[in-house]
């Protein structure tokens, strides 16, 4: 697990500059879902909180042999998705915290 977290942290760090120039409209579905989950669950908790949600998604996906999308959208896993669609939450990708969340999401 330590190896996964270290690898995840290194990858996230490497892509920070990329996230600052990335356009949200060109994100693939999985990146959008993971980034939205991170934002909905922890955008007020700073980068450490958002990173923790991303690490949680990555760990669950690894342990359960599921995709990050499956982990995020599984019923009762992340309350932000209960009764909601991507369209309902996509506005979160326009928040100031979105750049970092996208960076983390691309590395989950």
Question: What annotation goes with each model-predicted range?
Answer:
Residues 1-4:
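Positively charged n-region of N-terminal signal peptides that target proteins for export
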Residues 7-8, 65:
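Intrinsically disordered, low-complexity segments enriched in polar/charged small residues
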Residues 8-18:
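Hydrophobic h-region of N-terminal signal peptides that target proteins for export
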Residues 20-108:
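Bacterial extracytoplasmic/cell-wall-associated proteins, especially those involved in peptidoglycan
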């Amino acid at each position: 697990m330590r190896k996964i977290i270290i690898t995840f942290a290194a990858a996230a760090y490497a892509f920070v500059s990329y996230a600052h120039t990335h356009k949200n409209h060109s994100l693939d579905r999985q990146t959008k879902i993971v980034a939205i989950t991170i934002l909905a669950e922890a955008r007020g908790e700073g980068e450490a909180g958002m990173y923790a949600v991303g690490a949680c998604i990555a760990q669950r996906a690894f342990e359960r042999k599921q995709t990050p999308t499956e982990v995020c959208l599984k019923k009762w896993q992340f309350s932000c998705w209960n009764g909601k669609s991507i369209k309902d939450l996509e506005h979160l990708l326009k928040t100031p915290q979105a750049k970092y969340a996208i960076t983390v999401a691309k590395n989950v």
